[in-house]
């Protein structure tokens, strides 16, 4: 499941970084403030992982809904639901759900921080502006201050005219590259809190593994 909490991709050189980190910090703060204003956000995305050493090249489509510290993630036949206390991981193929206490510190990053985590704990640099799909994207490069992290670099692709995060690229220390491209994002949709809990009666004959 952890691989689905990663975000990554891109090919451009480090020599393109020319502007000061102060400019990058200002942009990151703008992005963070923008997303923190939302009461909720729903995003459709494409996730891919590439590892030449392990000969892996996979791509999956998914969607995520975030409301405060709660989230619901659907990808690769799995639904991961969290109400900030309990996490349910449901596998459609075998009609089974694992229930456990939510421990955000065990993952690569907290899902509810995906859009706002970048304004803390990173050294940032401003990169070049590129064009993708007819849009101008500003590239930001971030390195975690905590060298114990599983990744050593993140690249953010930010739409220039509205500060939306379009693509995030995470580079693992083991050589893997994770790509997370947001294809659609809608803020401020109303979701009842019950949307972020697993209701067993909606899944007839589901096998429940309570690991708490």
Name every feature range the model reports, one short phrase each.
Residues 61-109, 178-179:
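An acidic-aromatic
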Residues 18, 125-204, 208-212:
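Gly/Pro-enriched, hydrophobic low-complexity segments
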Residues 15-56, 69-70, 202, 207-212:
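N-terminal leader/targeting segments and the immediate start of mature chains
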Residues 38-40, 59-61, 68, 82, ...:
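Extracytoplasmic
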Residues 102-136:
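Flexible, surface-exposed loop/linker segments and immediately adjacent secondary-structure boundaries
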Residues 4-13:
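Sec-dependent N-terminal signal peptides
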Residues 47-49, 91, 169-172:
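Beta-turn initiation residues at beta-strand->coil junctions
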